[in-house]
Amino acid sequence: MESVALYSFQATESDELAFNKGDTLKILNMEDDQNWYKAELRGAEGFVPKNYIRVKPHPWYSGRISRQLAEETLMKRNHLGAFLIRESESSPGEFSVSVNYGDQVQHFKVLREASGKYFLWEEKFNSLNELVDFYRTTTIAKRRQIFLCDEQPLIKPSRACFAQAQFDFSAQDPSQLSLRRGDIVEVVEREDPHWWRGRAGGRLGFFPRSYVQPVHL
């Protein structure tokens, strides 16, 4: 994921990352702290205050969901090349690309070289965004012609759908989305009557339907 710095930030601790307004940062981890993200800029890594940056949203980024949930999600989409990028369950800051091969889901670990560039095979990229764009027009598979292709969820509102949290909800699983009472959530999937999927505060995950009330903005 990429983000744009809204303001300049001077690091005051050794584990923080300084940046200037307008810099493009790579977000490595969004899950561990509600106020700070781990990011990279010009080969240096550190924590940055999330209110100083704006994350560039992408429908293909699913955060820290499990391999099993990724497979279930993609197999429900009867669409060759449907894909998502998820954070590694075992190695924070690392990513995997999960792709619908038609009869199964294949997973590719995104590798990184010392300079910080991402790659799957020979080609190197400065960001996950560049990697995704490349494999939209170049096959990601070696033995088959499979291109990354966006697809809308099976059930998608005709216009943006939002809900407001009526209660606090603490995620019990990495695939879930923690909420505070009053939070506004953009609902992106309502396939399950008990668990909806939505986006809030730059994070994407599942939350109980009974904890929210639809609203019109």
Curated annotation (Swiss-Prot):
Free-text tissue specificity from the UniProt record: Expressed in inner ear, in neruonal fibers innervating cochlear and utricular auditory hair cells (at protein level).
GO terms classed as biological process: sensory perception of sound
Domain SH2: residue ranges: 60-152
Domain of life according to the entry: Eukaryota
InterPro entries registered for this protein in UniProt: GRAP_N_SH3, Grb2-like, SH2, SH2_dom_sf, SH3-like_dom_sf, SH3_domain
Bilayer topology term: Peripheral membrane protein
UniProt cross-references to Pfam families, sorted A to Z: SH2, SH3_1
PROSITE patterns in alphabetical order: SH2, SH3
Location (main, coarse): membrane
Location of the protein in the cell: Membrane; Synapse
Boundaries of every SH3 domain copy: 1-58, 158-217
Keywords: Membrane, Repeat, SH2 domain, SH3 domain, Synapse
The keyword Repeat belongs to this UniProt entry's keyword annotation: yes
Single GO cellular component term: presynapse
The keyword Repeat belongs to this UniProt entry's keyword annotation: yes
Family: Belongs to the GRB2/sem-5/DRK family.
Oligomer and partners: Associates through its SH2 domain with ligand-activated receptors for stem cell factor (KIT) and erythropoietin (EPOR). Also forms a stable complex with the Bcr-Abl oncoprotein. GRAP is associated with the Ras guanine nucleotide exchange factor SOS1, primarily through its N-terminal SH3 domain. Interacts with phosphorylated LAT upon TCR activation. Interacts with SHB.
Function: Couples signals from receptor and cytoplasmic tyrosine kinases to the Ras signaling pathway. Plays a role in the inner ear and in hearing.
Protein's name according to its UniProt entry: GRB2-related adapter protein
Gene name of the encoded protein: Grap
